[in-house]
């Protein structure tokens, strides 16, 4: 009996040891959680400009779509969206047109019912001309103007003016900005002439205009003077996991704001395709990479750019570090007047991404961010016929029921109706 008891105890001890070894092996083979906040990645784009044969699909970055038809109230007839923002409960919409119109039209987030206008044109308290962008946070909405170096703040519930927030580094910052807790994150690029241009990729400031942190690149100022400003363009900015990101034209680095700290996340190696900052706008620009937009999910970074008068996309896989690129024929910029030769490199339109979500497409480059993780296509009287044709011919989609819903909404549009917003949610 004693021998049998000893044998059983030994058997259970052996079983226990084997179980612990198995658990240890399982733990050892699990992949650690990746902390995006601390990673820095190098993307060698210059040596990977070899178009791949894979399809460039919208489902790679988008998980869902919904549609909101904006109510055509008498005092809320709008056209093509200029800028928009979608909160949890409302849609804030500014449209292309007269700068003296009401600045923002507010609609219900889900029904599209018109609620009110926000902002007045003029030069009195709380009044402004030419709104540029709109961002909503909590109970307030923040508007910018292309002629005032400050943000105008209004209450969402009644449109009442609250205050102005001075922008410490004003140039170009009104185009893109993010609102935090007593923080404005914006992207000035360069300030007014003061012996030399003050370069700046990203600024974090408080609501009183005090700078908390800024990213200022080291730039060769040779050749710059008050007549020859650096050619940077406007910010290519986006948010990922609620952290504002911006691509620096100066250093080809992507920076992100983490609370009151600015850190680099990516370096894009452009090699011979790097545009010299001192090169004035000319036909030569077609020989250099000009970035248009970025989208980001937990799996990849997707970017669009122009090169040699072609439309390009690249996809960087965060896990495998694989870089894929796509090249598309593109149309030049169209206007009612002859385009000067110096601007013929600008891309007007291209095929863009294949929309396998619902078939709707007005080219990916026209999909405008309307919140930190959503972008939209605005379907208007002007483009509805083109979009209807595209959607009707798109049969291989992830959400056929959404495709049918979209077709029915387009068919229901009358000559005086407001636009339909197709709102796409990024993965993550």
What are these regions (language model features)?
Residues 14-16:
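C-terminal motif of bacterial Sec signal peptides marking the signal peptidase cleavage site
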Residues 25-67:
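Blade/loop signatures of beta-propeller domains
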Residues 58-76, 116-127, 166-170, 210-232, ...:
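Surface-exposed loop and turn segments in beta-propeller and other repeat-based domains
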Residues 71-81, 103-109, 113-139, 145, ...:
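Blade-loop segments of beta-propeller domains
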Residues 79-83, 127-133, 170-179, 224-227, ...:
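Repeated scaffold domains used in trafficking and secretory/extracellular systems
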Residues 89-97, 139-145, 182-195, 235-255, ...:
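Short beta-strand elements that form the blades of beta-propeller/WD-repeat-like
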Residues 108-111, 155-159, 206-209, 258-261, ...:
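Short loop/turn segments that connect beta-strands within beta-propeller blades
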Residues 129, 144-200, 212-224:
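Asp-box/WD-like beta-propeller blade repeats and closely related beta-sheet repeat scaffolds
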């Amino acid at each position: 009996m004693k021998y049998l008891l000893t044998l059983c105890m030994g058997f259970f001890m052996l079983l226990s040891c084997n179980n612990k070894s198995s658990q240890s092996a399982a733990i050892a083979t699990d992949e650690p959680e990746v902390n995006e906040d601390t990673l820095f990645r190098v993307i060698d784009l210059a040596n990977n400009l070899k178009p791949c044969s894979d399809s460039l699909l919208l489902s790679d970055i988008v998980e869902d779509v919904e549609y909101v038809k904006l109510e055509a109230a008498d005092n809320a007839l709008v056209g093509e969206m200029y800028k928009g923002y979608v909160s949890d409960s409302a849609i804030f919409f500014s449209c292309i047109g007269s700068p003296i119109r009401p600045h923002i039209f507010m609609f219900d987030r889900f029904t599209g019912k018109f609620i009110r206008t926000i902002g007045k044109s003029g030069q009195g308290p709380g009044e402004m001309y030419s709104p540029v962008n709109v961002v909503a946070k909590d109970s307030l909405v923040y508007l910018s103007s292309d002629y005032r170096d400050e943000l105008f703040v209004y209450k969402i519930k009644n449109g009442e003016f609250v205050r102005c927030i001075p922008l410490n580094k004003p140039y170009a910052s009104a185009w893109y900005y993010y609102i935090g807790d007593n923080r404005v994150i914006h992207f000035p690029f360069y300030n007014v002439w003061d012996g030399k241009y003050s370069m700046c990729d990203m600024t974090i400031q408080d609501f009183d205009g005090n700078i908390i942190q800024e990213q200022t690149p080291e730039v060769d100022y040779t050749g710059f003077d008050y007549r020859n400003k650096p050619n940077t363009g406007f910010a290519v900015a986006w948010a990922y996991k609620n952290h504002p990101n911006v691509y620096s034209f100066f250093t080809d680095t992507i920076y992100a704001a983490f609370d009151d700290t600015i850190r680099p996340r990516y370096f894009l190696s452009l090699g011979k395709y790097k545009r010299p900052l001192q090169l004035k706008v000319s036909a030569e620009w077609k020989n250099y990479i000009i970035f248009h937009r970025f989208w980001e999910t937990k799996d990849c970074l997707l970017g669009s750019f122009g090169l040699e008068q072609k439309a390009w996309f690249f996809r960087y896989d965060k896990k495998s570090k694989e870089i894929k690129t796509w090249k598309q024929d593109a149309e030049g910029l169209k206007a009612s007047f002859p385009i000067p030769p110096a601007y013929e490199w600008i891309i007007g339109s291209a095929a863009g991404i294949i929309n396998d979500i619902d078939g709707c497409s007005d080219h990916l480059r026209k999909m405008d961010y309307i919140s930190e993780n959503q972008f939209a296509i605005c379907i208007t009287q002007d483009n509805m016929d083109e979009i209807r044709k595209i959607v009707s011919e798109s049969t291989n989609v992830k959400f056929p029921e959404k495709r049918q819903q979209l077709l029915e909404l387009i068919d229901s549009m009358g000559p005086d109706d407001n636009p339909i917003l197709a709102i796409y949610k990024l993965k993550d």
